[in-house]
């Protein structure tokens, strides 16, 4: 008899848990929240957030530690739950930002990214995993957030923000967080936020440094007030080119989340007219005051000339992508493909292979027959490296019995720096060094890894 009672009580407890789970799912559906976010591939109109006026017992338990803060309290938590935030970019900044906004109980999160998860993302983009490689980043992030806090409405967008869709999308959210990694998108997001009167919380991270500020908020400047003219494309470095220590975008993304939550809960914003700069090497923060909104600004000034979105790729002279840009500095005759170079190796044709990558990249991988002279050394004409080049060319000329100019092939990671090196070497040929014919290996070592040697490391 006792065993029967224990068994029945156990079954009853299990059924009660099932009923509680079903009630929770029903509540989510009634609030317009689905367990598995549906991926959006175009911008559609969203239904208004169901406004909360109080906290239930689960809310009080979940957010109890931040409810105890006098700066937030119940009023602030309710305000957070009634706010929607659009995160532009689900990468190194967007992942920690979205994670902490969801954990704090933001009402709706729009997650926008047109890219898919790659292995090289995982050291810094902490919402993605090995199992989500190949998935759209927006969907991967939304699913991770839904597992963490199912009460947050996640709307993943697998699309590229453009002049055609930005206004329609941004006007459906209360706050925008720019986590993008390219200049055209920054101008696009800024202008759309100004035209829709949305505050813009912007951050960036590169190498071991980060920056944070808030644009278009309570009379503060917009991005164009500070940067009316975009930088030359060749001066812009991104994570693919310059690298980044994973924890740095993590720090900046968390600070971004803090500013969003302060705006959402009605607290004073710290960086509406300040720029926070983080030096990860020294572990130091410093803040500098920014100039105020500019009367002559073309988008937020007294007489704006930009009243609709532009062609930002044309304006900036670069593509709206965080992928490495491809330079086209040489003629077709000055370049060879990796297949052509493989043929040169197979035929044992005498030549010099010059690797112009920085030493830190050469330490990762290299072709065994290459001579390493960094591009920077060629640009600065460092005597020790010019001497090294002269000796290598001289040795090869002796092997050829001085019958023809030495063939020099230049390689780098992607075929950009190698083109610059070819131009420098052609100017040196016959003057600072003996005559040579110089050609670039198109696509660089990453093309070699993809098309010739599948075991060669990619980075």
UniProtKB/Swiss-Prot annotation:
Cysteines engaged in disulfide bonds, as pairs: 316-324
Family: In the N-terminal section; belongs to the HesA/MoeB/ThiF family. UBA4 subfamily.
Free-text function comment from the UniProt entry: Plays a central role in 2-thiolation of mcm(5)S(2)U at tRNA wobble positions of cytosolic tRNA(Lys), tRNA(Glu) and tRNA(Gln). Also essential during biosynthesis of the molybdenum cofactor. Acts by mediating the C-terminal thiocarboxylation of sulfur carriers urm1 and mocs2a. Its N-terminus first activates urm1 and mocs2a as acyl-adenylates (-COAMP), then the persulfide sulfur on the catalytic cysteine is transferred to urm1 and mocs2a to form thiocarboxylation (-COSH) of their C-terminus.
Species this chain originates from: Danio rerio
One GO MF term: molybdopterin-synthase sulfurtransferase activity
Entry keywords, A to Z: ATP-binding, Cytoplasm, Disulfide bond, Metal-binding, Molybdenum cofactor biosynthesis, Multifunctional enzyme, Nucleotide-binding, Nucleotidyltransferase, Transferase, tRNA processing, Zinc
Segments forming domain Rhodanese: 347-457
List of residues binding ATP: 92, 113, 120-124, 137, 181-182
UniProt name for this protein: Adenylyltransferase and sulfurtransferase MOCS3
EC category name: transferase
InterPro entries (UniProt xref): MOCS3/Uba4, Rhodanese-like_dom, Rhodanese-like_dom_sf, ThiF/MoeB/HesA, ThiF_NAD_FAD-bd, Ubiquitin-activating_enz
UniProt binding sites for Zn(2+): 222, 225, 297, 300
EC number: 2.7.7.80, 2.8.1.11
Catalytic reaction list: [molybdopterin-synthase sulfur-carrier protein]-C-terminal Gly-Gly + ATP + H(+) = [molybdopterin-synthase sulfur-carrier protein]-C-terminal Gly-Gly-AMP + diphosphate; [molybdopterin-synthase sulfur-carrier protein]-C-terminal Gly-Gly-AMP + S-sulfanyl-L-cysteinyl-[cysteine desulfurase] + AH2 = [molybdopterin-synthase sulfur-carrier protein]-C-terminal-Gly-aminoethanethioate + L-cysteinyl-[cysteine desulfurase] + A + AMP + 2 H(+)
Subcellular compartments: Cytoplasm, Cytosol
The UniProt record lists the keyword Disulfide bond: yes
Catalytic residues of the enzyme: 239, 412
Superkingdom, natural source: Eukaryota
């Amino acid at each position: 008899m006792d065993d029967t009672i224990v068994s029945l009580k156990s079954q009853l407890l299990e059924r009660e848990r099932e009923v509680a789970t079903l009630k929770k799912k029903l509540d989510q559906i009634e609030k317009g929240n689905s367990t598995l976010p549906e991926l959006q591939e175009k911008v559609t109109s969203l239904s208004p957030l169901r406004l909360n006026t109080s906290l239930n017992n689960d809310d009080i338990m979940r957010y109890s530690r931040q409810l105890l803060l006098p700066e937030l309290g119940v009023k602030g938590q309710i305000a957070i739950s009634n706010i929607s935030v659009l995160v532009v970019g689900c990468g190194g900044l967007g992942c920690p930002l979205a994670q902490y906004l969801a954990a704090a109980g933001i009402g709706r999160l729009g997650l926008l990214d047109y890219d898919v998860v790659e292995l090289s993302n995982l050291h810094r983009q902490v919402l993605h995993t090995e199992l989500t490689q190949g998935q759209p980043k927006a969907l991967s992030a939304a699913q991770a957030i839904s597992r963490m806090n199912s009460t947050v409405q996640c709307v993943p967008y697998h699309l590229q923000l453009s002049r055609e869709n930005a206004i329609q999308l941004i006007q459906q959210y209360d706050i925008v967080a720019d986590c993008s990694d390219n200049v055209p998108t920054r101008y696009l997001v800024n202008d759309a936020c100004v035209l829709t009167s949305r505050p813009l919380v912007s951050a960036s991270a590169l190498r071991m440094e980060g920056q944070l500020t808030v644009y278009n908020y309570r009379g503060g400047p917009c991005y164009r007030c500070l940067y009316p003219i975009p930088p030359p494309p060749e001066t812009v470095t991104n994570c693919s080119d310059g690298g980044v220590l994973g924890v740095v975008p993590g720090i900046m993304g968390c600070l971004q989340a803090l500013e969003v939550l302060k705006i959402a809960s009605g607290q004073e914003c710290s960086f509406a007219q300040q720029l926070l700069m983080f030096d990860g090497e020294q572990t130091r923060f410093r803040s500098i005051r920014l100039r105020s909104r500019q009367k002559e600004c073309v988008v937020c000034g007294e007489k704006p000339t930009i009243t609709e979105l532009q062609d930002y790729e044309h304006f900036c002279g670069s593509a709206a992508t965080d992928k490495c840009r491809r330079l086209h500095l040489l003629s077709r005759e000055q370049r060879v493909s990796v297949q052509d170079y493989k043929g040169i190796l197979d035929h044992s044709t005498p030549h010099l292979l010059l690797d112009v990558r920085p030493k830190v990249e050469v330490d990762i991988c290299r072709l065994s027959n290459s001579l390493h002279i960094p591009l920077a050394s060629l640009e600065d004409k460092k005597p020790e490296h010019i001497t090294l080049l002269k000796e290598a060319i001289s040795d090869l000329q002796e092997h050829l019995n001085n019958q023809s100019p030495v063939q020099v092939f230049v390689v780098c990671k992607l075929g950009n720096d190698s083109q610059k090196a070819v131009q420098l070497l052609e100017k040196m040929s016959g003057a600072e060094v003996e005559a040579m014919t110089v050609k670039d290996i198109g696509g660089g070592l990453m093309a070699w890894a993809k098309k010739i040697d599948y075991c060669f490391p990619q980075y």
